[in-house]
């Protein structure tokens, strides 16, 4: 260990405080800290900090972006409800691409389930479905089913490779989970794990924070760290070697995600796009989601906090919100575009500043848990690269068909939790049964008066205000119904199981057939 050399580097960067407890450390602790610090480029970190804080200060004092915003023009927008006559063509295009082994999916799975009250990766979470499948298993089975559908339509076996970006904290447990479950039926060589980078937390004056005497406080560098990670681990080269042309990028916490959605992929390809965003219609002006729009003519996501209430409330002539393209971290990239981002544009991306309460060791060596923000974490966002697209498109889908994020524990505010995720999936599957000609009956044999949401699968323009308003039983809970992704990817192919049949809930349809679970032993 060349400690003097390290001391000099730290001194030049104004970070010499990181060795203030050096003489108190055991030899093993010294080695640990030395290795951690040796791996850091302090000049680069200081530069990141200066730029991030400069941008943060500028945006804090700037007016809102309202005057510079324009909504997504109709010509770059595809809609699952307003473009029904084209859905079949888009789906056929997507399935054709999949059948030629040209499509891969990229999962952003770096998040731990901290807000869910668990210490393991979010993808390993079970929201309490009758099958008790985890998010990872549901997504894996959707990939398997889509491979089968493409094969059925085109007659040749195909593969959808699955690239999974984890963080340092979730990598090992994620890999172990997949190994334990035999990759959920997927071939091991087609599931590629890679790790996003980490950045140290810094105080407001640019000093790297120690969380222990021998340990720097580190945090993942945001889902936009994807691009740096792709470069560091040669992932784009792997995609090229496999002949991949299109990538579907999505976030692990959406239980309804249509992984490698052939309609979305087909739409983007037929539009000649190099980059696309899937969005849901924002119907409530105060919903805290970012919106996809143009600012100064350039596509980007504008966060809810960046626009005034008056702008958020503006409506177009058809009554919809003017800025209604709600971002759901669900994107399409071509591989050449991704390659350009990784090799050319990534260094131009700005870090965003998140002010945080960061536990630290003070100069006396005491561990402090602050009660107000004392520093920043720097992160990039996956959507920051929209600005570099040559042809950007937006695909709007129904929230109740495709978006129910899992962010909070059930004990929290009643939104985006295991119960809402479970209910969203069961409501959707209930619709599928009704649309395929099945019926539900109560314990007396009377048909339940549930009307299917006709909007499912883009069959009507009717959009309901409350996702589950007519799909609940007397206890205001959706009818329990779960259909395995191995049976149906998006509601197709169910007629043989349910047409003209009556079912008691709970109903499960899986590869072993149709099961009506008996409640309370009756």
UniProtKB/Swiss-Prot annotation:
One of its GO terms (molecular function) is UDP-N-acetylglucosamine diphosphorylase activity. Belongs to the UDPGP type 1 family. Its main location: cytoplasm. One of its GO terms (cellular component) is cytosol. It is an enzyme of class 2 (transferase). One of its GO terms (biological process) is innate immune response. UDP-N-acetyl-alpha-D-glucosamine 1 binds at residues 108, 110-111, 196, 222-223, 251-252, 290, 303-304, 327, 381, 407. This is UDP-N-acetylhexosamine pyrophosphorylase. Disulfide bonds: none annotated. It is found in: Cytoplasm, Cytosol. UDP-N-acetyl-alpha-D-galactosamine 2 binds at residue 472. The lineage of its organism: Eukaryota, Metazoa, Chordata, Craniata, Vertebrata. Its EC number is 2.7.4.-, 2.7.7.83, 2.7.7.23. The keyword Cytoplasm applies. It catalyses: N-acetyl-alpha-D-galactosamine 1-phosphate + UTP + H(+) = UDP-N-acetyl-alpha-D-galactosamine + diphosphate; N-acetyl-alpha-D-glucosamine 1-phosphate + UTP + H(+) = UDP-N-acetyl-alpha-D-glucosamine + diphosphate; 5-diphospho-1D-myo-inositol 1,2,3,4,6-pentakisphosphate + O-phospho-L-seryl-[protein] = O-diphospho-L-seryl-[protein] + 1D-myo-inositol hexakisphosphate. It comes from the Eukaryota. Keywords: Cytoplasm, Immunity, Innate immunity, Nucleotidyltransferase, Transferase. UDP-N-acetyl-alpha-D-glucosamine 2 binds at residue 472. Catalyzes the last step in biosynthesis of uridine diphosphate-N-acetylglucosamine (UDP-GlcNAc) by converting UTP and glucosamine 1-phosphate (GlcNAc-1-P) to the sugar nucleotide. Also converts UTP and galactosamine 1-phosphate (GalNAc-1-P) into uridine diphosphate-N-acetylgalactosamine (UDP-GalNAc). In addition to its role in metabolism, acts as a regulator of innate immunity in response to virus infection. Regulates innate immunity by catalyzing pyrophosphorylation of IRF3 phosphorylated at 'Ser-386' by TBK1, promoting IRF3 dimerization and activation, leading to type I interferon responses. Disruption phenotype: Embryonic lethality ar 9.5 dpc. Monomer and homodimer. Pathway: Nucleotide-sugar biosynthesis; UDP-N-acetyl-alpha-D-glucosamine biosynthesis; UDP-N-acetyl-alpha-D-glucosamine from N-acetyl-alpha-D-glucosamine 1-phosphate: step 1/1. Coiled coil: none annotated. UDP-N-acetyl-alpha-D-galactosamine 1 binds at residues 108, 110-111, 196, 222-223, 251-252, 290, 303-304, 327, 407.
């Amino acid at each position: 260990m060349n400690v003097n050399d390290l001391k000099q580097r730290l001194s030049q960067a104004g970070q010499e405080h990181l060795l203030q407890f050096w003489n108190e450390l055991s030899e093993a602790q010294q080695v640990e800290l030395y290795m951690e610090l040796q791996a850091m480029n302090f000049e680069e970190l200081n530069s990141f900090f200066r730029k991030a804080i400069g941008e943060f200060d500028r945006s804090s004092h700037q007016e809102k972006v309202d005057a510079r915003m324009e909504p997504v023009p109709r010509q770059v927008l595809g809609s699952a409800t307003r473009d029904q006559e084209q859905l079949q063509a888009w789906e056929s295009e997507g399935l054709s691409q999949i059948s030629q082994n040209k499509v891969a999916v990229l999962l952003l799975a770096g998040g731990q389930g901290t807000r869910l009250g668990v210490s393991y990766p979010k993808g390993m979470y079970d929201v309490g479905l009758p099958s008790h499948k985890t998010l990872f298993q549901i997504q894996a089975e959707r990939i398997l089913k889509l491979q089968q559908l493409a094969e059925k339509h085109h007659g040749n076996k195909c593969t959808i490779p699955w690239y999974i970006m984890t963080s340092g904290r979730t990598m090992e447990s994620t890999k172990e989970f997949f190994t334990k479950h035999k990759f959920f039926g997927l071939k091991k060589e087609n599931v590629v794990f890679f790790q996003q980078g980490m950045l140290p937390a810094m105080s407001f004056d640019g000093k790297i924070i120690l969380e222990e005497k021998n340990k720097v406080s580190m945090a993942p560098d945001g889902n936009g760290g994807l691009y740096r990670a792709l470069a560091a681990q040669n992932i784009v080269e792997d995609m090229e070697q496999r002949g991949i042309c299109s990538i579907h990028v999505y976030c692990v916490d959406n239980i309804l995600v249509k992984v490698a959605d052939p309609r979305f992929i087909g739409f983007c390809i037929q539009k000649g796009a190099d980059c696309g965003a899937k969005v849901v219609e924002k119907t409530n002006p105060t919903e805290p989601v970012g919106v996809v729009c143009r600012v100064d003519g350039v596509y980007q996501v504008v966060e809810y906090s960046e626009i005034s209430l008056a702008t958020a409330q503006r409506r177009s002539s058809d009554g919809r919100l003017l800025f209604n393209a709600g971002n759901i971290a669900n994107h399409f990239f071509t591989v050449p575009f991704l390659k350009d981002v990784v090799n050319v544009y990534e260094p131009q991306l700005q870090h965003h500043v998140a002010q945080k309460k960061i536990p630290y060791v003070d100069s006396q060596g005491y561990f402090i848990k602050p009660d107000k923000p004392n520093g920043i974490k720097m992160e990039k966002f996956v959507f920051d690269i929209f600005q570099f697209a040559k042809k950007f498109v937006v695909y709007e889908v129904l929230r109740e068909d495709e978006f129910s994020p899992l962010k909070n524990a059930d004990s929290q505010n009643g939104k985006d939790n295991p119960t809402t995720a479970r209910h969203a999936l069961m409501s959707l599957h209930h619709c599928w049964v009704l649309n395929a000609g099945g019926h539900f009956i109560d314990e007396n044999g009377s048909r339940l008066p549930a009307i299917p949401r006709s909007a499912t699968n883009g069959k009507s323009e009717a959009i309901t205000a409350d996702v589950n308003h007519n799909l609940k039983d007397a206890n205001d809970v959706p009818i329990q119904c779960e259909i395995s992704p191995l049976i149906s990817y998006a509601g197709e192919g169910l007629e043989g199981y349910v047409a003209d049949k009556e079912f008691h809930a709970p109903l499960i349809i899986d590869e072993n057939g149709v099961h009506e679970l008996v409640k309370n032993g009756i």
